């Protein structure tokens, strides 16, 4: 996805992002498809539930400018330096019943953004574990 923002007093801003992911049903269920929309299958064995394994990569680039470090004490920023980030996510879903799901994700983040406070690029690379229980009808 690419976006361009018109700005009155500065050059236009352009940023982009994209992702790709895949999901595999470990217990052999088939995906439903109706009217151009995929649907989550029901567990083949309601007693054991359905297990899924997923992988995702996403990235965003919100830098549309540059930093001139000719004078390290006072770098000059031109344009927008919104940062860059990419993530790898590995996840597992367990559909305990047809209307109850447990999800767990592990996310590795790689991000970098220019900081005017420290006058340099700052990396932030957390590792995140997410867990969710979901009831739906």
Show the residue positions of the predicted features.
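Outer-membrane beta-barrel pore domains
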Residues: 1-137
């Amino acid at each position: 996805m690419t976006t361009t923002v018109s700005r009155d007093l500065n050059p236009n801003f352009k940023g982009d992002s994209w992702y790709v992911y895949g999901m595999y049903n470990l217990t052999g269920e088939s995906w439903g498809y109706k009217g151009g929309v995929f649907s989550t299958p029901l567990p083949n064995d309601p007693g054991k539930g359905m297990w899924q394994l997923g992988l995702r990569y996403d990235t965003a680039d919100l830098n549309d400018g540059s930093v001139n470090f000719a004078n390290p004490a006072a770098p000059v920023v031109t344009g927008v330096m919104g940062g860059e980030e990419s993530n790898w996510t590995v996840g597992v879903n367990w559909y305990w019943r047809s209307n109850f799901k447990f999800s767990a994700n592990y996310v590795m983040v790689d991000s970098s953004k220019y900081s005017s406070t420290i006058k340099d690029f700052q990396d932030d690379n957390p590792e995140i574990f997410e867990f969710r229980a979901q009831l739906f009808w």
